[in-house]
Amino acid sequence: MKLSHLDEKNHPKMVDVSDKNITLRIATASGIIYMSQEAFDVIKNNTAKKGPVLQTAIVAAIMGVKKTSEIIPMCHPLMLSKVETNIVEFVKECAFKLIVTVKCEGKTGVEMEALSGVSIGLLTIYDMIKAIDKSMRITDIVLESKEGGKSGKFVRS
């Protein structure tokens, strides 16, 4: 399989999307951070010394989405239409799941933006709580779904 971001000499290049049609692009990604009961309670009770952890993680996730083309070398800068975040608590597991959905009308997909948003949001939670629990585990960062473009629709089963 020939990779589109390599030229005929196997040198990296940014894919030329100028001939692609502008279509609605939507992608959703998610990831989970597991932690100790103490760390979970500090977040839930909003008593972290660094401030409101989940609210800060949401803002960080949005910033991560917007900065994707600056930190992932072959990503195109995109005019985003919407970034939506959701955090689900798993009380029994002392975990939070961050879900990020990104939307735009463009010539290339927003999968990397959604994945970057999840990654940055979860890393922000880690950063804000690491004084309490350095053993936190970030896991299962995945693309949940995407639609638009030539490859069509994908939904994780």
From Swiss-Prot:
It comes from the Bacteria. Substrate binds at residues 74-76, 112-113. This is Cyclic pyranopterin monophosphate synthase. Belongs to the MoaC family. It catalyses: (8S)-3',8-cyclo-7,8-dihydroguanosine 5'-triphosphate = cyclic pyranopterin phosphate + diphosphate. InterPro entries: MoaC (IPR023045), MoaC_bact/euk (IPR047594), MoaC_sf (IPR036522), MoCo_biosynth_MoaA/MoaC (IPR050105), Mopterin_CF_biosynth-C_dom (IPR002820). The active site is at residue 127. It comes from Campylobacter jejuni subsp. jejuni serotype O:2 (strain ATCC 700819 / NCTC 11168). One of its GO terms (biological process) is Mo-molybdopterin cofactor biosynthetic process. Keywords: Lyase, Molybdenum cofactor biosynthesis. GO terms for molecular function: cyclic pyranopterin monophosphate synthase activity; GTP 3',8'-cyclase activity. The lineage of its organism: Bacteria, Pseudomonadati, Campylobacterota, Epsilonproteobacteria, Campylobacterales. Homohexamer; trimer of dimers. Catalyzes the conversion of (8S)-3',8-cyclo-7,8-dihydroguanosine 5'-triphosphate to cyclic pyranopterin monophosphate (cPMP). Pfam families: MoaC. It is an enzyme of class 4 (lyase). The gene is moaC. NCBIfam families: moaC, PRK09364.1. Its EC number is 4.6.1.17. Pathway: Cofactor biosynthesis; molybdopterin biosynthesis.
